[in-house]
Amino acid sequence: MEEPQKNDLSMREQEEEHPVRSSGPQISVSEFSCHCCYDTLVNPTTLNCGHSFCRHCLALWWMSSKKTECPECREKWEGFPKVNILLRDAIEKLFPDAIRMRVEDIQQNNDVVQSLAAFQKYGNDQNPLAPSTGRVNPQRGGGFFSGVLTALTGVAVILLVYHWRSRESEHGLLVHKAVDKWTMEEVVLWLEQLGPWASLYRDRFLSERVNGRLLLTLTEEEFSRAPYTIENSSHRRVILTELERVRALGVKPPQNLWEYKAVNPGRSLFLLYALKSSPRLGLLYLYLFDYTDCFLPFIHTICPLQENSSGEDIFTKLLDLREPTWKQWREFLVKYSFLPYQLIAEFAWDWLEVHYWTSRFLIVNAVLLSVLELFSFWRIWSRSELKTVPQRMWSHFWKVSTQGLFMAMFWPLIPQFVCNCLFYWALYFNPIINIDLVVKEVRRLETQVL
């Protein structure tokens, strides 16, 4: 009786040491091998098609192919693949020594570690919701947000269609018509565009039947006495200054966004994208290559010389060609260094009376771009990547310069319709895209905190 008991004990010990072998058919390591590296599965990740691979093998495959499909059957996966916990635990219990050696080798390979980090970051971008929220109904939160974006897109489309159909033809604008061919109504239109105060003198110009030819002959003395009687010296100076510009150019100089776009379609498109993607380089370009026409009016608008100049007319600031003072330069350089998009928002704020909706789109877009820039700086700081800032700056400078050079080279070949589409897209639809980007950054930040 003692010998059978001893045999039973020895068999139980063997079963405890080799549980797989004692259960009938033996299981080999090859049955738990990855079909990419043909080695034991480490952190096995099962795809929708049912195939399982090492997680680092899947990351390397994704990095090299940039495709979200199975390396074996090429079926696309949905969502973001996760580690098969049950299969992982079973393999670690069956082959602990092999798994431990493989994990050590993987951790020592920098390329594999970087691929895993990039793959996980891609997954976080695909699933930005915080884990603590559980499985939130996507139709509840996402549906509301998509509804807001749809409404904003609809407003942008309506505004674009209204503007495109209601505004004058670009060929009919005064910026394209010689002064000596202006009619009485066009002279009055030119006068009213100088500012709200110019409406005081509208009837006087109409009663004298002032057309383009007569306008060119008027002098300061004639403006100061009857029948014009412009007693306000500031008003008279603005009219004379603008009249000198008209005489020098032969046409009306642009005084709003649409007239500037009609006269300078290429420059307006270039400046819009430059100030959107790289405001610091865009303002530097204005300082170096467009100092008198663009930079001086810009700095006098956002950094006025007098503190009580808030009531000053916007067109008066545009005609101010005096050199900025040191106080203006200090204010400008501080904002230029830390909040460049605020400069654009302040400039658009002064144009609210002229461009009601367009200025608001620009202001909102400037705020969103400032928030995205702050998120970028925070990401660099939190990841201790300050050493990469010079390289990032050089890459950004090279990218913007290359795009500007490419546009300058191929500008004559680009159809005007395409340029208009790009212009209106950046003006009205880019803020809607940036709203979505800001929401994603906020959700990603919540995920990292939680």
Swiss-Prot record:
Q: Provide ranges: composition bias, Basic and acidic residues.
A: 1-20
Q: What happens when the gene is disrupted?
A: Bfar-deleted mice show a twofold higher levels of PNPLA3 protein than in WT animals with no associated changes in PNPLA3 mRNA levels.
The reaction(s) annotated as catalysed by this protein in its Swiss-Prot or TrEMBL entry are: S-ubiquitinyl-[E2 ubiquitin-conjugating enzyme]-L-cysteine + [acceptor protein]-L-lysine = [E2 ubiquitin-conjugating enzyme]-L-cysteine + N(6)-ubiquitinyl-[acceptor protein]-L-lysine
**EC assignment:** 2.3.2.27
| Glycan attachment points | N232, N308
Write down the membrane topology. Answer: Multi-pass membrane protein
Q: Does the keyword Transmembrane helix apply?
A: yes
Does Isomerase show up as a keyword for this record?
Answer: no
Where found? Endoplasmic reticulum membrane
Q: Where is the SAM domain?
A: 182-249
Per the UniProt topology annotation, the Cytoplasmic ranges are 1-140, 353-360, 426-450
Q: Which residues lie on this side of the membrane: Extracellular?
A: 162-331, 382-404
Which molecular function GO terms apply here? transferase activity; zinc ion binding
* Post-translational modification (record): Mediates RING-dependent self-ubiquitination leading to proteasomal degradation.
Q: Name the InterPro entries for this protein.
A: SAM, SAM/pointed_sf, Znf_RING, Znf_RING/FYVE/PHD, Znf_RING_CS
The protein's matches in CDD domains, at most eight in alphabetical order, are given as: RING-HC_BAR, SAM_BAR
- State the Gene3D superfamilies in the record: Transcription Factor, Ets-1, Zinc/RING finger domain, C3HC4 (zinc finger)
Segment Disordered: which positions? 1-25
**What does the protein in this record do?**
Membrane-bound E3 ubiquitin ligase that plays a role in several processes including apoptosis regulation or reticulum endoplasmic stress. Has anti-apoptotic activity, both for apoptosis triggered via death-receptors and via mitochondrial factors. Contributes to the dynamic control of IRE1/ERN1 signaling during ER stress by inducing BAX inhibitor 1/TMBIM6 proteasomal degradation. Promotes the activation of TGF-beta signaling by mediating the 'Lys-63'-linked ubiquitination of TGFBR1 which is critical to activate the pathway.
Q: How does it assemble?
A: Interacts with CASP8, BCL2 and BCL2L1 through SAM domain and also with HIP1, IFT57, ESRRBL1 and BCAP31. Interacts with NGFR; this interaction inhibits NF-kappa-B and JNK-related signaling pathways.
Protein name per Swiss-Prot or TrEMBL: Bifunctional apoptosis regulator
